[in-house]
Amino acid sequence: MPAARLAIMADDTNYGSLGALAPNWSDGERNIDTDEIYKRFFEWVADVKGVEPWPHQEEAIMDLLAGDHVILNTPTGSGKSLVALGMHFAALCTGRRSYYTAPIKALVSEKFFDLVEVFGRENVGMITGDTHINADAPIICCTAEILANQALREGRHADVGCVAMDEFHYYGDSERGWAWQVPLLTLPNTQFLLMSATLGNVDAIADKLEDMTDTDVDIIADAPRPVPLTYEYTLDPLEKTVELAFGRGETPIYVVHFSQDAALETANALASTGVSSKEQRAAIAEAIKGTKFTTAFGKILQRLLRTGVGIHHAGMLPRYRRLVEQLAQQGLLPVICGTDTLGVGINVPIHSVVLTALTKFDGTKMRKLRAREFHQIAGRAGRMGFDTEGLVIAEGPEFEIENAKALAKAGNDPKKLKKVKRKKAPEGFVTWNENTFDKLIDATPETLVPHMKVTHSMVLNEVEQGGDARYRIDRLIDDSAQTPEQKERLHDRADEIFQTLFDTNVIETEDRDDGGKDYFMTVDMPDDFALDQPLSPFLLAALELLDLESENYALDVISMVEATLEDPKQVLRAQERQARDAAMIRMKEDGLDYDERMDRLQEITYPKPLEDMLQAAFDEYRHDVPWANDYWLSPKSVIRDMVETASDFTGYIARYNIARSEGTLLRYLSDAYRALARTVPLEKRNEQLRDIISWLRVVVRSIDSSLVDEWENAGAGTDASEAAANLAAPGAKQAVVEDRRGLTVLVRNAMFRRVQLMDLDKPDELGALDKDWGYGVHEWEDALDDFYDEHEYVNTDAKARSGELFILDDSKENSEHSWKVRQIIDDSDGDHDWAITGTVDLDTTQSSGEVVFFDYSVSN
């Protein structure tokens, strides 16, 4: 939890020790000279870090102190972070604001806490779009896009003294590379430290940066790898490869896959092969003793961890990923199966990397790994301070492994060898061999291909700066590293955007005495424009289309919010698959022939509530607000679906069979909660919508509280020190029920979900929900038989779900930490003589995100 971590830091004797060596920023103390900066910094490195810097680190910091730019193209584990620390310290000592940028929020957040630990919380801030902590601090951690937008808004006048750009190979990313190029072109007074282990040839970048800033650029690319690597290509089955490495003591092992499903499949296979010792398993059991594995995937993870096998990928809950990282850092996990997220910022010590393939699906096709991708992954092998070398193993293709197995079985018998039928690569299969592996080992990362774009938001950021925005946009394009053909297209795009902004009266110009033009806006830019929720202004406008008195108002607001959020693709695919399966059954029952079924099936997709109304409104909005053309709506129903079906997190995961994508769903729910809580005005919230927002907070917080804490302690305006103080405040969380409204909705939903399943006559699903408190399948079958002997059907309309039929007794909340609840069933005869009654375990319910009962009954 972020605030907790800050509180712990305050007790660390070395907390803020480097920041204490710098002049006081807020008091305007006198700057110190470079010799003294160098002396203080490296004395701190020796005394506090207890390490001796490598020559390339000293060289880089000396270059930075001399005022030069530095491109640090050195291997993984070669201490790039220490150089960045030196740059931040030098900036703090000379009265300059410094920035650290990274491609993903998780890395920004991690670096923020690292810097707080050494510089002190008053000296470090963080901006990630949805999070603002101490944004006026002398050291700012942010995503690359945040800095790029600031550079466009403020240009040469930006208060950006120096920037450490981590993972600079993103400069070559086709979608996001513009954000790494823009600051180099628009901040001529800023010093840059560009860092990555896989930059390739950077001469063109260095020349461009030197030309734009009239400052020398020093390239440091000859640092030796601290832990050398050895390479091995094998045709052994994966399980045997891991077994052999385990036997040779070459653990921990990270087995790299290029899909989440493949990672889990391997983890399950390895869990049964005995990859850990009895002592390791006992240590793991002790380490995870207090961990709650409450979700479906959590139970899978718990089983795997107890065998010594970890799993790590982006679809997991953040708390599960952190747990795996912590166990690995403690040396408790011999094997981790994961995806190639290993290559970006995962903090896991690894001795051996095993690549299960040398190809990957890039979103459009299968292709061989590029040199940069390979070295990003392979470079993680070898633990500095632990290993004398790291090991990188590549598995051959499955068909080649089968061939090798057959040949080995034949031995040296010529007759048997002759009978061996060699398998061939499947048709269309992109294959690889040992030569592929050797070429990747020897290859240097490809030269980064620059990317640039021009959007409405970029133009408006320039206009907001004042002066001749058109000249600066043209200059940005001309100065960019793009080809002449690309520049021509960018100029054409700029023409279109400026014309649109003029036609819609969003911008105007004034002639200057010197013959130039000043551009200015006729409308106010939203405060969070082009950050995490660029369509928030549209959402506010679209809310006016809804009737606050409508029965579906709250659900329609949710649909509007969902249309502005990023798609949780795995969840939507599962919805579509289930909808198509149900449609196929209906079409078969209706006697449709195969071809017609297939044609109709292609038209079926996941639910998109209010699609026509929203699209029409958005088209009109884009006419009046042209910068919205940079974005698009994506109607969907995840939150709404959960509300309408009274689903909790666990039930929704089970319903769509998406246990492997729990993290994806949770991140989406978290984004939805933030959007609802921050964007929808209080006067636009009716009672049902307030209930839903509270319920959503309870769901997200109970599954993984860090996602809510991070935003509420930071994004809502609380600075880091206040967050830590609030967290530690006596009595801050003494209440048995932290969020009464949200928890009440959670319980009501759980009870009504059972009513819905009664209506559908689903004893199997009801039994699965209630077996732990004495109502398994057989008990529910008996209850349903008795109910339907007396009544024809169950109502599930709004009246059946109303508060009149739900009774909550909280008299034992404080004494026994329980609620007595009763859901009256709205039967066909209106007798209301049947009810589901239970005693809710408040503590377990709030920590698990699903309702847990002490006792339970269904009766009349």
Which residues make up each language-model segment?
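Conserved two-lobed SF2 helicase motor
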Residues: 136-152, 307-321, 327-347
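Conserved C-terminal RecA-like helicase domain
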Residues: 99-101, 109, 116-125, 261-335, ...
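Non-catalytic terminal extensions of ATP-dependent helicases
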Residues: 310, 329-330, 413-416, 421-813, ...
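Conserved segment of the helicase C-terminal RecA-like domain
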Residues: 352-355, 359-361, 367-408
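Conserved interdomain hinge at the start of the Helicase C-terminal
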Residues: 232-258, 265-268, 322-331
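Conserved P-loop/Walker A NTP-binding site and adjacent catalytic elements of P-loop NTPases
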Residues: 44, 50-228, 234, 252-277
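Helicase-associated low-complexity/disordered flanking segments
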Residues: 1-70, 275-306
